[in-house]
Regions:
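Nucleic-acid endo/exonuclease domains
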Residues: 1-132
Length: 132
């Protein structure tokens, strides 16, 4: 079951994000899309959103998922070229540091693994990071 978006309007989803949403839904996991924390913002003051937040039955946060499109790894004019890449990577770093500081499991799925996305793939990444 998906819950309302937190932090604003849903941005256009990529194929990888759509696939992740389908896996989470089919598995019956409770999740929210575009999840944000009030104290995690970009250098411009905008909330930094995670693609998915997955919750347990008590609605406590279990882990976060970020699908890393090509714009996370190389400059693309559609995403602001080199400047956009630097901003993206800075924001990615802030998200990783935030999760580490708050003991939150963050699963980052690179676009090169799009074809591998299924329930077992996601859960193996979760368990590899100490999930239970």
């Amino acid at each position: 079951m998906s819950y309302p978006v937190i932090g604003g309007d849903k941005v256009r989803a990529s194929r990888g994000e759509i696939k992740i949403e389908e896996v989470l839904t089919k598995a019956g996991l409770v999740f929210e899309e575009e999840y944000s924390f009030p104290d995690l913002v970009s250098s411009s003051g905008r909330p930094l959103r995670f693609d998915f937040a997955v919750f347990n039955d008590e609605y406590e946060l279990e882990f976060l998922i970020e699908y890393q499109g090509i714009q996370h790894y190389s400059p693309k004019s559609k995403f602001g070229g080199y400047s956009g890449l630097r901003k993206q990577q800075f924001n990615d770093m802030k998200k990783r540091e935030y999760c580490k500081k708050h003991n939150i499991i963050l699963i980052a799925i690179p676009y090169t693994d799009e074809g591998r996305i299924n329930y077992d793939y996601i859960m193996n990444l979760y368990y590899a990071q100490g999930g239970y």
